[in-house]
Amino acid sequence: MFEINPVKNRIQDLSDRTAVLRGYLDYDAKKERLEEVNAELEQPDVWNEPERAQALGKERSSLEEIVTTIDQLDQGMDDVTGLLELAIEADDEETFNEAVAELDILDGKLGQLEFRRMFSGEYDSANCYLDLQAGSGGTEAQDWASMLLRMYLRWAEAKGFKTEIIEESDGDVAGLKSATIKIIGDYAFGWLRTETGVHRLVRKSPFDSGGRRHTSFSSAFVYPEVDDDIDIEINPADLRIDVYRASGAGGQHVNKTESAVRITHIPTNIVTQCQNDRSQHKNKDQAMKQLKAKLYEFEMQKKNADKQMLEDNKSDIGWGSQIRSYVLDDSRIKDLRTGVETRNTQAVLDGDLDKFIEASLKAGL
């Protein structure tokens, strides 16, 4: 005799998850809009305006992905329920297995739609930059910044992303004052965008001869790589461009010349820097690309009332804007936004971040 209840529970779970997505993705409004778009595309004169026709075609594809998938899920769950009833009546294991197989397919489709829900932002599919900045705590904070860099590099490697270290500024004694890395791969920004914020470390400091407990802070800021054709106006008069000798890993080849470049956008006080190439010209181009991306994110955050502005995220590297607390002596890491925590601190510092990231994405942060 086959197990009926687990399958019934799965059907209920799929039904509940589909209902949540139907509301979140505003299925009714999208279905109505899809009908309107289809009607417009059927008009004989639609291609008199090619750009509008292309935009409508793109909108239709996006709407169909949601509407069709939810329709298929609704119909599929009705079909599976019917197959399960037949299997029970006829005591037919083959029909039962067919119902389970259909359920697996539906689960996969729903998972793809849930993925879309998490990554629905305009630039979620883009590559991204990650800036790390040591804050309160001196050498301890600078060592913490280097630990965070290692953590994110390990995470990116495990996810199959490529990384480039754009800039590293060594700490006074150990660690890093700042670093910028580029993460390359599908949905890199989508995965990392909720990591922006202040990360707090509490531990017995290896730099304290008395072995006392120290609290230190470092900030992370994530922003997407933007297309070159995005129109972001930058007035050259608003820029201060400094050149300096590179430091940090990889800087040994360029230390003899001032090839590293730092660009400050004076109106916003946004700073970008690059030192990963021997050519000052190439470093300047890369720093300008980062500046363009940061300014774009700055404008997007200003427009979104539900997000903190860039100035808030960057200003107070201290208690005010923490997202996660890493208390190593107590073996406890806790996300202060979602409440997710773990005692496997070493795994997290080795890059096992998905538990935290997925919770923040599902919470819509």
Curated annotation (Swiss-Prot):
Record keyword Cytoplasm present: yes
A Gene Ontology cellular-component term: cytoplasm
Pfam families assigned: PCRF, RF-1
Stretch forming the signal peptide: none
Any one GO BP annotation for this protein: viral translational frameshifting
Family: Belongs to the prokaryotic/mitochondrial release factor family.
Note from the entry: The gene for this protein contains a UGA in-frame termination codon after Leu-25; a naturally occurring frameshift enables complete translation of RF-2. This provides a mechanism for the protein to regulate its own production.
Protein name as catalogued: Peptide chain release factor 2
Gene: prfB
